[in-house]
Structure formats: C-alpha cells, structure tokens
Swiss-Prot record:
It catalyses: 2 (2R)-3-phosphoglycerate + 2 H(+) = D-ribulose 1,5-bisphosphate + CO2 + H2O; D-ribulose 1,5-bisphosphate + O2 = 2-phosphoglycolate + (2R)-3-phosphoglycerate + 2 H(+). Keywords: Calvin cycle, Carbon dioxide fixation, Chloroplast, Disulfide bond, Lyase, Magnesium, Metal-binding, Methylation, Monooxygenase, Oxidoreductase, Photorespiration, Photosynthesis, Plastid. RuBisCO catalyzes two reactions: the carboxylation of D-ribulose 1,5-bisphosphate, the primary event in carbon dioxide fixation, as well as the oxidative fragmentation of the pentose substrate in the photorespiration process. Both reactions occur simultaneously and in competition at the same active site. The modification N6-carboxylysine is found at K192. Heterohexadecamer of 8 large chains and 8 small chains; disulfide-linked. The disulfide link is formed within the large subunit homodimers. The keyword Cell inner membrane does not apply. This is Ribulose bisphosphate carboxylase large chain. It is an enzyme of class 4 (lyase). It is found in: Plastid, Chloroplast. Its cofactor is Mg(2+). The disulfide bond which can form in the large chain dimeric partners within the hexadecamer appears to be associated with oxidative stress and protein turnover. GO terms for molecular function: magnesium ion binding; monooxygenase activity; ribulose-bisphosphate carboxylase activity.
Length: 468
C-alpha cells in the first residue's frame, strides 16, 4: 500500500472541526443550511465546507500531493435556527490562499459556485461573509466614494435627490432628454436611465447620451448647481461598455451607470477601474438581485451582494426603501446600509450582521432608496437613511399633476423642509406629516403632490425577516 485508501468517507470526518480557531486572514461565511431528511447538520455543514473548497465526493490519490490541512474550508460551528424546523446556521472558514487577489468573480465561484445544487441539502443560503482586511486591501473598491462625490458635486448636509425617467422604454432620445432637463431644472441632483435602457431601436445609446448631456448643461446653467444623469453604459460586451463610458467622459458628464448583476462582476470591476482613472462617478443598479436574494432559505442574502459590490466598485447602489413598493425590512436594510457606508461595522445579529467587518480604507458607497416612494415618505426616508444617501423618486416626480419640473420642485421642497426641521431638533418620525403640511403653505407644487399621493400605501409583509 502507498498510504492511499480509496472509497467514500463522510465529509464531517475531514471538514467538521469545532475546535478550529479562526484566523484574522480567513474568509468567514455563515450559511443557512436545510439538510435533507436523515442528514445530520454536522455532515451538511461539512459538505458545504468541502464542496466550496478542496473536497469532492470521493477520496482521490492526488490529495496526497498537497496539504489539505492548509487549504481546506472548515465548518467550525453550527447553530440551530430558532423557530425554524431543520434549519441551521453553519459557519465556514476558508483560508485566504484559496482566492485570487482582487477578484470578486473568483471569490463567488469558490464559495457559492457549485455547492448550491448539492443533493444532501434541501436548501442553502449564504447569509453573510466576513472579508478580512488582508483580502479587502487587494481591491480598489468604489471609484471615488462618498466624500469625493460630495466634493465633486459641491453638495453637503443633505441626501441627494434622483429620479428615474419613465416610461422606461419607448421614448425617443430627444423626448427623453427633455424629461431629464425638466427634472433637473426643477431641483433634482440626478436623473437616471432605467436599468433596461441600453441601446434599443427606438433610442440608440449615442443619441441618448448627447441629448442627456445637453439637458444637463442647460439645467446647470439655469440653476447654478452641478447636475448628473446616470448614463447606463451596460452593454452586451465589456468592450462596448467601456466604449460608452469613454463617450460619456468625452461629453464631460459626471456619472455613468451599470447593472452589476446582469453585467457580471468582471465587467463591473473593469468599469469601476476605468471610472476611477477618468474621474467618472459610477451608479450601480441591482437588477436581478431578487432572483438571488428573495427566498429566505435559499440563495444569497443582499448584504453579501452589497459587500461584493463595495469590493468590485460602485459609488451608488440601490438598497431598498423600507417604506415604498419594493422589499426592504427596516433593521435588515439598515444593517447592509451601514455595511455599504461605514469603515467598521460590529457584529449585530438583531440587524442580520453575523460578523464584524473592517473595511480598512475602502471608500464607502451611497445607498439609493428607490421604488414607490413619494413626498409623504420624505420625513421617514430622511430619518432612516440620513444625509449620506440618494433618494430616488421616479413616479413620485413624473407623476405630479403639473408635470416633471413641478414634481421635482415638490420633492426638493419636501427634502429641504425635512432637513431643516431635523437640524432644528424636531422629531421627523412624530412630526413628519406636520412638517410636510407646513411646507405646502409656501409651495403650491408640494401641496399638489401631497394631494395626489395622500392615499397611496403598499401594505405587504416583507418576505425576508429576521429570525425570531
């Protein structure tokens, strides 16, 4: 015998190591595991660790050519999920040498690439990742970050205001540019291409970029404020995407946009590097995220996708609203909003944060609240998200009975009123409606908006809630 014993052995004999002390350089993962009936949780957790690192289903002789102890993932702790039958949180530690430096693509391919189709598991969800500083430092991260963006735009002490141009598809480039101009002239900081506006027959990208740039400069000249429009550079190839970003830079506009999940992390990181080198801000839309993160027991939680985006690079990212038409439970949302903005975030299970995360010097990302929000939500949004955020009202601007510019005026007046009231020490949660009503007295545009949307509510329970 040469010391190689062929055959199949239980994963837990090699990959379940409850005595393991995690290292500062390990990438730590928290998986929500639902094993098949009859599979013990230790075996399920060990299987996840094995299949997402060095293991396969049988012993192979080439295992003897390397040091498995150095390279294997380890399931080092298992907790039962309170209130759920047959669900466990399995904590897995991965040695840093398993991952290519500066590659979110490789990190995800390793950790979630194969294991989610594993037969011994009924369902699997990646709840959180701890990225060690040693790995964080291999990433450029956001092209500019929150402070540099404020300096570029010369806007301080309040959230920024945006608007997605609707109808999202079907407008000609000239009419699209007109809608952009009216919104920006009315007082918004940004307007936005919808995520599926790329380069379709009714509006080719180059025409849209030109008319939007014209709208931008006209609105800037009239208002004396710096304006931006998120020009969506997402395309079918990376080369085409960069070509669009180059054209945006040549036009002198401040910001471009990318759909990072449909476009992919490799494309996103390439674009983020281009944006830093050329002074462009980068707005990130999370189209397709709910396919991955909506189910509570299977997939990847958005806080992981948010961390991945901060590493890959983006200056803004959509992060739910807590109050509008799209998913977003308050404590969970605030948990990943902090992970986007702050340098250091403590473990806090009450907000779904499984690990303490130290971002060292990686710039922060502005969370974007968008989806079914309007002027009545302004006090809540100002209080929940604070100054370092972008509040985006699509229908809540363009749906104004008097048109786009008055819709923009209404939002800007409501925001300024809320910020002023907060700075005076008033309680936005308690007095929010009164603050908006007072502001209506000297803004007919706001009064008209308040009248239109006074009855609108989206009362559905959040699907993804904290474990009780």
């Amino acid at each position: 015998s040469v010391g190689f014993k062929a055959g199949v052995k239980e994963y837990k004999l090699t990959y379940y190591t409850p005595e393991y002390q995690t290292k500062d350089t390990d990438i730590l993962a928290a998986f929500r595991v639902t094993p098949q009936p009859g599979v013990p949780p230790e075996e399920a957790g060990a299987a996840v660790a094995a299949e997402s690192s060095t293991g396969t289903w049988t012993t192979v002789w080439t295992d003897g050519l390397t040091s498995l102890d150095r390279y294997k993932g380890r399931c080092y702790r298992i907790e039962r999920v309170v209130g759920e039958k047959d669900q466990y949180i399995a904590y897995v530690a991965y040695p840093l040498d398993l991952f290519e430096e500066g590659s979110v693509t490789n990190m995800f391919t390793s950790i979630v690439g194969n294991v989610f189709g594993f037969k011994a598991l009924r369902a699997l969800r990646l709840e959180d990742l701890r990225i060690p500083p040693a790995y964080v430092k291999t990433f450029q991260g956001p092209p500019h970050g929150i402070q540099v963006e404020r300096d570029k735009l010369n806007k301080y002490g309040r959230p920024l205001l945006g608007c997605t141009i609707k109808p999202k598809l079907g407008l000609s480039a000239k009419n699209y540019g007109r809608a952009v101009y009216e919104c920006l002239r009315g007082g918004l900081d940004f307007t936005k291409d919808d995520e599926n506006v790329n380069s379709q027959p009714f509006m080719r990208w180059r025409d849209r970029f030109l008319f939007c740039a014209e709208a931008l400069y006209k609105a800037q000249a009239e208002t004396g404020e710096i304006k931006g429009h998120y020009l969506n550079a997402t395309a079918g190839t990376c080369e085409e995407m960069i070509k669009r970003a180059v054209f945006a830079r040549e036009l002198g506009v401040p910001i471009v946009m990318h759909d990072y999940l449909t476009g992919g992390f490799t494309a996103n990181t390439s674009l983020a590097h281009y944006c830093r080198d050329n002074g462009l801000l980068l707005h990130i839309h999370r189209a397709m995220h709910a396919v991955i993160d909506r189910q509570k027991n299977h997939g990847i939680h958005f806080r992981v996708l948010a961390k991945a985006l901060r590493m890959s690079g983006g200056d803004h990212i959509h992060s739910g609203t807590v109050v509008g038409k799209l998913e977003g439970e308050r404590d969970i949302t605030l948990g990943f909003v902090d992970l986007l903005r702050d340098d250091f975030v403590e473990q806090d299970r009450s907000r779904g944060i499984y690990f303490t995360q130290d971002w060292v010097s990686l710039p922060g990302v502005l969370p974007v609240a968008s989806g079914g929000i309007h002027v009545w939500h302004m006090p809540a949004l100002t209080e929940i998200f604070g100054d370092d955020s972008v509040l985006q009202f699509g229908g809540g601007t363009l749906g104004h009975p008097w048109g786009n510019a008055p819709g923009a005026v209404a939002n800007r007046v409501a925001l300024e009123a809320c910020v002023q009231a907060r700075n005076e020490g008033r309680d936005l949660a308690q007095e929010g409606n009164a603050i908006i009503r007072e502001a209506c007295k000297w803004s007919p545009e706001l009064a008209a908006a308040c009248e239109v949307w006074k009855e609108i509510v989206f009362n559905f329970a959040a699907v993804d809630v904290l474990d009780k």
